[in-house]
Amino acid sequence: STPLYSSAASAVYKRQDFFRGIEPRTLSRTRIAYAYDIKVFLEFLLNENPSIKSTYSKISDIPLSVLENLSVTDIEEFMEYLKYRDNDGRKISNKENAVKRKISTLKSVFKYFYRVEKISENIMERVQLPKLHTKEIIRLDIDEVAMMIDEAENGEGLSDRQKAYHEKTKVRDVALLSLLLGTGIRVSECVGLNISDVDFKNNGILIHRKGGKEVTIYFSDEVKEALQNYCDERVLILEESGHEGAFFLSMQNKRMSVRSVENLVKKYARIISPLKKITPHKLRSTYGTNLYKETGDIYLVADVLGHSDVNTTKKHYAAIEDDRRRSARNAVKLRES
């Protein structure tokens, strides 16, 4: 277990009942996040709640019974505290989804201890989760997609120093951007690709989704051409030991990292769309948007993007869905005019 997990978990009243209770249905990283959230909450109580501050000197001293005596106001004050707090002189702010996650964690903790009858009152039942404001998805427009691939191909907007490297990487860069923009795969799935995962006969790649699930994703002939051009170069490169079979290689002949792909995308995006903050994930959003506009099938988009819940997809593409509904209003005629 990590030091953070241990210290925060022990802070939850020197027992790990809660973590033991949720272990069968949660990932270890989820439990670590829960532990951190609980630690932040207990620190808030100790530092900001006058009655607790005057009674206890450290978070591990706070008894479980304290949870029974909290009010909805205490939790609302915690939400305010989360938005902007001072931690040992370090200013920390939380975005809406981070605040919501911490409140969700508390709901789980209170619910668990109430269910096992360790507390007689569950104040969190009366606390509403903060509402998230949906942000407009940042993505490339259709002409910007073409411009980005063109820029990777010709490098016209690059500095002289960048152009020297570009000669060696342009075929790889075009292949990588074409794959991200033409399939919507995650950057982690992209860098995890091996030569053996690419099937040119069927225009498919075998990728490993979150949770270890293997899926075949299919690509267009346009993407195939870009991948084939890179593959012709790739087979002539001897990769470094420990990186055998990696499809996308760095200049050091090692498997590309997520960070290097992020930098690559940023480099070309700055040239073609300086006002948009484009990341590899935004290329995924671009693909999802274009696929949805072309097909109108939200279930297909969810499946191809690997969303386990179609509601996640609906939430992301709600604005386009609204446009489609608006366009439907004139589709059915009641009387010929």
For each feature predicted by the language model, list its residue ranges.
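Conserved catalytic core of the tyrosine transesterase superfamily
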Residues: 7-337
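Short, exposed "boundary/linker" segments that immediately precede the start
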Residues: 1-2
